[in-house]
């Protein structure tokens, strides 16, 4: 089949590569416009745009998905199907109607659970043991179209959202190719999503990523892992923001008041509402990430100092 692939971030690149290696023809990609990045705020093409350029494929970067020039070019390309992975913009009905077999989205949850922009983060945040990826036909309602297929993935006790997304990007790419193969051979009929088990996963903001050490250790651990690498968990120390990497809950350790820091030559412990957690890496404002023990030696943490104090 003739395909136009839509995607933007790094997590979409394995799917593009898998489709390029398949028997189908990727005639173009659609991605978000170049965005400012780095300290110099220089415009940088998306990972999908860069990969497509390497492969010699036409790249479309509409500012709006209903841009008339974009829609005209999409019609000229005459795709049979448009696979989508984390494109990052809502598609209008006029665009949805162009390909003969519609737009097929790869979503990183087991729908109807965790519809929305941050399914992996919410799966970790809420303590799910299993997640996965789903291919489905895009319709106007968010992530609610009929399902072609799924693949499951266990969530490990130390998984971050970055770890989990990396695995799902690979297994999801294989699922997407199998789905496109099945559609091309008229072997797949999508099934409607059920009305039970629907949940939503809105994008996590920096405010959502602030760690509350008056919460139980389990919740602190899940929040930090869910927000790693993005948007990045953080707290405040001596009036400045400090980012926190994943922690290790210590259920057998002596309790500490929430947020209170205790540093040894090897470890830094922080109190929560239940038991302490051991810090891994921290990143003080304006500095690079470093082991928590190195940070504590440089900061010369005093008795009774705590995270969260402004």
Curated annotation (Swiss-Prot):
Stored Pfam families: Formyl_trans_C (PF02911), Formyl_trans_N (PF00551)
Biased composition (Basic and acidic residues): 300-310
Protein name listed in UniProt: Methionyl-tRNA formyltransferase
Keyword check for Protein biosynthesis: yes
Family: Belongs to the Fmt family.
InterPro entries, sorted: Fmt, Formyl_trans_C, Formyl_transf_N, Formyl_transf_N_sf, Formyl_transferase-like_C_sf, Met-tRNA-FMT_C, Met-tRNA-FMT_N
Role of this protein: Attaches a formyl group to the free amino group of methionyl-tRNA(fMet). The formyl group appears to play a dual role in the initiator identity of N-formylmethionyl-tRNA by promoting its recognition by IF2 and preventing the misappropriation of this tRNA by the elongation apparatus.
Natural source organism: Thermobifida fusca (strain YX)
């Amino acid at each position: 089949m003739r395909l136009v692939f839509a995607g933007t971030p790094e997590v979409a690149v394995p799917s593009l590569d898998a489709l390029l290696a398949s028997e189908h023809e990727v005639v173009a990609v659609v991605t978000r416009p170049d965005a400012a990045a780095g300290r110099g705020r220089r415009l940088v093409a998306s990972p999908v745009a860069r990969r497509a350029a390497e492969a010699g494929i036409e790249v479309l970067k509409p500012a709006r998905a209903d841009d008339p020039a974009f829609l005209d070019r999409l019609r000229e390309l005459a795709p049979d199907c448009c696979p989508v992975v984390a494109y990052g913009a809502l598609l209008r009905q006029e665009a949805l109607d162009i390909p003969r077999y519609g737009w097929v989205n790869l979503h990183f949850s087991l729908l109807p659970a965790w519809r929305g922009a941050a399914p992996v983060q919410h799966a970790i945040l809420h303590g799910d043991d299993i997640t996965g990826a789903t291919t489905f036909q895009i319709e106007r309602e968010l992530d609610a179209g009929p399902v072609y297929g799924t693949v499951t993935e266990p969530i490990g006790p130390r998984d971050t959202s970055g770890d989990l997304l990396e695995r799902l990007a690979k297994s999801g790419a294989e699922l997407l190719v199998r789905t496109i193969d099945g559609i091309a051979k008229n072997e797949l009929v999508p099934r409607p999503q059920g009305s039970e088990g629907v949940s939503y996963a809105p994008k996590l903001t920096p405010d959502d990523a602030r760690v509350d050490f008056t919460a139980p250790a389990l919740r602190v651990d899940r929040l930090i892992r869910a927000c790693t690498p993005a948007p990045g968990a953080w707290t405040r120390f001596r009036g400045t923001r400090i980012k926190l990497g994943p922690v290790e809950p210590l259920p057998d350790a002596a309790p500490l008041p929430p947020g209170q820091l205790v540093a040894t030559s090897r470890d830094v412990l922080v109190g929560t509402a239940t038991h302490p957690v051991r810090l891994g890496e921290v990143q003080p404002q304006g500095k690079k990430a470093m082991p928590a023990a190195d940070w504590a030696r440089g900061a010369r943490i005093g008795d009774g100092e705590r995270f969260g104090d402004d």
